[in-house]
Amino acid sequence: MSEAVDVLVVGSGPAGSSVARRIREIAPELSVLIVEAGPDLTPDAPGENVRNLPAAERLPLQIRVSGPQPVGFQPFGSRPLHARPGTVLFREDDGSGDGQEGMPGGAFSANVGGMGAHWTCAVPRPSGSELSDVLGREEWDAAFAVAESYLKATTAAFPETPASVAVLAALRGVYEERLAGARPAGPMPLACEPTAQGPRWTGADTVLAGSPVPVPIRSGTVVVAIRAEGGMATGVETVDAVTGAREEIPARAVVVAGDAIRSPQLLWASGIRPPALGCYLNDQPQVTVGARVDVPRVNAAIDAEADLRETLTGVCWVPFADGAHPFHGQVMQLDASPIRFHVDDKRDERPMVGLGWFLVKDVRREDRVRFDDARPDAHGLPGIVIEYGLTDRDRENVARAKREVAALAAALGEQTREPQLLPAGSSLHYQGSVRMGSVDDGESVCDGSGRVWGTENVFVAGNGVIPTATACNPTLTAVALAVRTGEAVAAQLAGGERRGR
C-alpha cells in the first residue's frame, strides 16, 4: 500500500491539472497526487504540448501513444478511420454506415498531459444557451478568468499577415450584420505564449508550473477502482500499466478527471452509479470544407522540417450566437488546422484555409456510453459500448452548415471541394456523460462543484461535466469547472467540512 494522500486526481490533462493547481493555491498544506494511465512523453517538462517540439522529435512520441500511422496521405474522415497522431480510437472502425451512429471517430489520449499534449489550443468562451444555469453569470465569469490565466489564453497568438487580414475582412463582411449585438468574428482565443519563434502551446506543464507547491504525477498507473464505504471514498486501487502489479493508494478525496468516456467507466467499475451516469453523451457534429483565399502568399517557402501548424498565419473564428448563428466557426490556414484536407496538384499561390463548423446537437438521454462487465478490457475495467446518433433536427442543421461554409468559401476565394460532415466523435469534444445539475433528480451525475451525487468525497472534472448543448471548443469551460472543483475540495478538506449526501 502506498503512502496516503489528501487528494488523488485521476487523469493529468488540463482539467485534472487545474484541479490540482487550484487545491495547492488555496491549501498548500494538502498533499495532492495525480495518477496517469499513460507514459510521460516529455520527462523534462511532464505534460508539455508536443507541438512545441520539432517534427522529428514529435512523431515518435505520438506513435508511442497511437501506434504506427497509415502510409501516404489520408484525408481526415476517410473510412475506415485511423486515429490521428497521439490518440487511440475507442473502437476499431469497420467503415460501415454513414459514420454518425455509435461515434466511430471517438478517441482518447493516454499519456501525461492527456489530450492537452496534442490539442490545437482553441479556448473561446461559450455564451448564451451554451452556459448552464447551474452556475450564475458572476460565478461563470470568475471561473473563466482563472481558467484563462491557467491556460494563458490570448487573441494575439499570431502576428497580422496579409492572409489573416483578408480572411478577417471577408468574415466581417459576411457576418457583421448577422452578428450585430453579439460577439463579432475575430482572432480565435488560443492557449499559448506568443514568442519571436512562434507560439509556445499550452499543456499540462503550463498549468502546473503555476502551482505554488509542485504536484507529483505518477505515470503508467491505471486506476481500476475507487474504494468507498457508505458513499465515502477511502482511496483507489491501481494497476501498473507495464508489470500488472496492483496497489492501493489511500486518499481523503478522489477526483476523476478523465475524458467523457473513461470517467464514467471508472465510476461504473467502482459501483458508483448515479442513474444518469454515461447518459446525455454529447458530441459536436463537425462540417468542414477547404478554400483558397484571394490574397498572394507572402512566404511560399516553408521549412520541410517545420510543423506546418506552427507557422505564423493565424486562426479566426465566427462565434456561436443564439438565434443568429447556431454554429461555432473556425477558419484556420492549413498550417494551423488539426484536420488534413486534400489539395489538388495544380500550382496555386493563394493560401489554403480549412473551415470547420461545429454544431450544437440535440442532447438526449439515449445518447450514452454503457458498460459491459462481461467483456472487460486488458486492465479489468468494463467494456465500452457507445450508443449515439443524430436526430432529424441535427441533420437539418448539418445541411444548413454545409450551405453556410460553401457560401463562405466562395466569399473567401475558391471552394476546393464539397463540404463534408466528419464521422461522429471527430471533434474530440464529447461531453455530458458525468453532467452537473442543480438537484439530485436522476438527470445529472454531480453538483455544480463536481461532487458526485450520493458520495461525500468523490468528484468529477473534465468535458463530461458540461451538461448543455455547446458549439464552441469545451476545454476552457472544462477548466473553469475544474477550478471550482479544486476550490470545493480544498474547502472541504482544509476546513474539515463533511458534506451531507
UniProtKB/Swiss-Prot annotation:
FAD binds at E36, S109, N111, M115, T120, A122, V223, N463, T475. GO terms for molecular function: flavin adenine dinucleotide binding; oxidoreductase activity, acting on CH-OH group of donors. Its EC number is 1.1.3.50. Coiled coil: none annotated. The active site is at H429 (proton acceptor). Optimum pH is 7.6 to 8.4 with carminic acid as substrate. Binds 1 FAD per subunit. Keywords: FAD, Flavoprotein, Oxidoreductase. Its cofactor is FAD. Monomer. FAD-dependent C-glycoside-metabolizing enzyme that participates in the degradation of certain C-glycosides by catalyzing the oxidation of the hydroxyl group at the C3 position of the sugar moiety. Shows oxidase activity toward various C-glycosides such as carminic acid, isovitexin, isoorientin and mangiferin but cannot use puerarin, orientin or aloesin. Shows weak activity (100 to 1000-fold lower) with O-glycosides. Probably plays a crucial role in the metabolism of C-glycosides in nature. This is C-glycoside 3-oxidase. It comes from Microbacterium sp.
